[in-house]
Amino acid sequence: MNKTPTTLIIMDGFGMTNGQSGNAVFAANTPRLDRFFEEFANTTLSASGLDVGLPDGQMGNSEVGHTNIGGGRVVFQDLPRITRAIEDGSFFQNPSYLRAMDNCLKNGSALHLMGLLSDGGVHSHITHVFALLELAKQKGLQKVYIHCFLDGRDVSPTSGAGFVAQLAEKCRELGVGKIATVMGRYYAMDRDKRWDRVEQAYDAMVYGDSEITNPDPVDAVKKSYEKGVTDEFVVPVVCDANGTVSENDSVIFFNFRPDRAREITRALVDQEFNGFTREFFPLTYICNTEYDASMPNVEVAFPRVLVNNGLGEYLSSMGMTQLRIAETEKYAHVTFFFNGGSETVFPGEDRVLVPSPKVATYDLQPEMSAPEVCSQCVERIESGAYDVIILNFANCDMVGHTGVFDAAVKAVETVDACVGRVVEATLKMGGIAMITADHGNA
């Protein structure tokens, strides 16, 4: 007997605002969504700050939105959790941090701090690396190197030079720490197995091998701007040839969001890694949070706090079937993050991963893989196999991040067309469709 599905459609990055300037959602032609808003009950939701477990005034993001939707409650996030630990002093007694630093003292080896250098608060926060430098000073470490991944997505695309300058000043103030490399997150924080990018980041940090060397990291970033290359895309630059990651060193990756921290981490710690050719050597490696339960040879400074009885777990406990479907860029969001940061696949839960297109930036293909996600979702709705279907359309967020307005408009229009098809298929099966977003970006 066919099931009547409830379909939860998450339009990633689809934001509602009264402002018209730079508003791709307003500018787009969206006849299907317009009709739904006119004919069916709807409201707006806050997806930032305290309403989703972030600090007051902190913008939302995909991870946080999916965690709260899947949890069915306000789930306090890693950013305020780590910040509170700094404020109450427990950060400076964290056993994993202390083991990393004690390893350096024991072996006369170096401590490497690496991560996204910005105050965006989505993947990391600059105050956290400042606190790690303070702890390194307290422990009397001499060899401390920082590998800076520049942002340009969650903050201004030319704010990186300022953040690097702040870090350099903090190192001078504390008398500890040297900036070893700077590079755009495009290279160091890939999440789609574009190993050619990750390899360039790895080579700079491990071998000191890069196209550009510059002992002045701020100048290196500014020179990149002069070439029209902004923070996200700054090619890896080696600033201190002595700051390479070597055997028996300690590494603390201060990103707290897992999805873009996994690939470079696995390249550094997993003996079975085969994304590109590199040598394996032992490290004391600290992940700020749990990036992947299967990640070998790492410790976790802030283990995850489980969200019990979230939507997926509850549906499973009721004997209901559920489908999670998204393209690569948002697959982790409808699975790992939606399940409260758990890798668990619940009984009755099926998953479909549609590959994201292999393009340099998504403004070049603003439809991304939404048509294929849509087609596969419709096929499974019509199969009558699922009680609940949870899907994500990535376009508004991923194309919005490029800052290319016309492409963002096309992304919104693509989502409008796909949502229309999914809603139509759901209603034909006698089901219910719910349309929402995780946060606003387009």
Q: What do these predicted regions represent?
A:
Residues 320-380:
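Metal-dependent catalytic core segments for phosphate chemistry
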Residues 155-246, 252-253, 261-264, 269-281:
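Long, well-ordered, tryptophan-enriched scaffold segments
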Residues 408-442:
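Metal-dependent active-site segment of extracytoplasmic phospho-/sulfohydrolases and closely related
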Residues 2-7, 14-186, 196, 200, ...:
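Active-site nucleophile/metal-coordination loop of metallo-enzymes that catalyze phosphate/sulfate
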Residues 83-91, 356-367, 400-413:
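Glycine-rich tight-turn/loop motif centered on a GG-T
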Residues 8, 112-114, 252-253, 388-392, ...:
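Structural motif
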Residues 95-96, 142, 385-418:
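Active-site His/acidic residue clusters
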